[in-house]
């Protein structure tokens, strides 16, 4: 087991990391004792970096963290990961009023937020930086470019109403998995990836499990690899099979309170993977999919997804997905609160 030292801020850098074996573990904070300092796990590489093939199963590729053992990464618990506006924020304003209390320890100066659009133009999504916090009032470092509604719409007869307030998500975490930037990054869109999977070698099965909470994925995913047998998403579970809630031997996987901050493919996918809990995550700027599910019994609860780009169709669509529990589906524009 490799446990990352939590005595100081840490930065680790590699082209490929592979965790392989029943007793092989990479630990950076646990659910009971989250990582307290700042940690950056930087994955390096570009389109010319040699792939790391597995003996069978999906290709690990490059700029990758492969999990065929156990991975535990837990950052500091940020509390509420997203909320809504309590009042309309006008274009040109540098303050927003939130509808719910947030933890000022994490919703703090320097932290990044994403504010969803409330018009028909998805590119009115705004990524902003906090300058100061006073209760539910947040002052930003720059003025807003667009109006974001904080309102409720009701039918004239009062028979129904809808909250149409813009969502506000917290993107910053103290633990980050980062795709290293490079000169051709904008053209190649080749970010970091985490693959949780299994393979067999000489009669032994190496199966991966991952517990990931309060982690920020920065410049993740690799554009162009979208097939179910090789999904180069920010985080993909492939042939993971069953997660067992609370299993003491570690056969449990979940993704909770994470932020996917600027992705070059889908943020997250589950393929031949069952019973994984994916809850309270904030997803900003994805390609093709926000989250893709091809498993059974996976639980997607209270996740916010903003700005999904469908490049092949040459159009953009903003996905705002709040709460859904379903399986055997591809998630495109699911709204169910």
Label the model's feature ranges.
Residues 1-86, 105-128, 138-210, 302:
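Extracellular beta-helix/beta-solenoid repeat scaffolds
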Residues 178-262, 274:
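Conserved, compact domain cores that house catalytic/ligand-binding motifs in diverse enzymes
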Residues 7, 23-25, 38, 181-190, ...:
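Short glycine/acidic-rich loop motifs that flank beta-strands on beta-rich extracellular proteins
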Residues 91-134, 242-246, 250-254, 263-269:
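A conserved hydrophobic secondary-structure block that centers on an alpha-helix together
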Residues 31, 112, 118-120, 133-135, ...:
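An acidic- and aromatic-residue-enriched active-site/binding cleft used to recognize and process polar
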Residues 132-138, 222-223:
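Short, conserved beta-turn/loop elements at beta-strand boundaries and strand-helix junctions
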Residues 173-174, 209-219, 249-264, 274-288, ...:
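Right-handed parallel beta-helix
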């Amino acid at each position: 087991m490799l446990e990352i030292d939590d005595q100081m801020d840490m930065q680790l850098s590699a082209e490929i990391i592979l965790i392989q074996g029943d007793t092989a573990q990479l630990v950076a904070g646990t659910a009971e004792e989250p990582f307290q300092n700042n940690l950056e796990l930087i994955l390096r590489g570009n389109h010319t970096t040699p792939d790391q093939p597995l003996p069978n199963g999906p290709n690990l590729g490059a700029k990758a963290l492969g999990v065929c053992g156990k991975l535990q990464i837990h950052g500091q618990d940020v509390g509420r990961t997203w909320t809504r506006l309590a009042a309309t924020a006008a274009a040109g304003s540098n303050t927003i009023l939130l509808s719910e209390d947030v933890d000022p320890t994490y919703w703090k100066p320097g932290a990044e937020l994403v504010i969803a659009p409330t018009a028909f133009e998805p590119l009115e999504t705004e990524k902003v930086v906090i300058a100061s916090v006073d209760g539910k009032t947040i002052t930003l470092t720059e003025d807003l470019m667009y109006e974001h509604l904080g309102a409720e719409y009701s039918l004239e007869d009062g028979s129904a109403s809808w909250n149409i307030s813009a969502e506000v998500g917290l993107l910053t975490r103290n633990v980050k998995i980062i795709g290293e930037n490079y000169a051709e990054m904008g053209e190649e869109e080749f970010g970091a990836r985490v693959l949780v999977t299994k393979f067999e070698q000489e009669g032994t099965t190496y199966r991966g499990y991952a517990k990931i909470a309060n982690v920020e994925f920065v410049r993740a995913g690799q554009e162009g690899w979208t097939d179910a047998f090789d999904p180069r998403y920010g985080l993909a579970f492939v042939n993971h099979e069953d997660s067992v809630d609370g299993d003491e031997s570690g056969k449990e996987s979940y993704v909770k309170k994470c932020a996917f901050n600027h992705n070059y493919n889908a943020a997250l996918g589950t393929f031949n993977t069952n019973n994984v809990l994916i809850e309270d995550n904030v997803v900003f700027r994805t390609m093709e999919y926000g989250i893709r599910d091809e498993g059974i019994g996976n639980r997607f609860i209270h996740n916010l997804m903003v700005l999904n780009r469908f490049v092949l169709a040459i159009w953009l669509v903003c996905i705002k997905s709040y709460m859904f529990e379903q399986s055997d589906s591809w998630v495109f524009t699911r709204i169910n609160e």
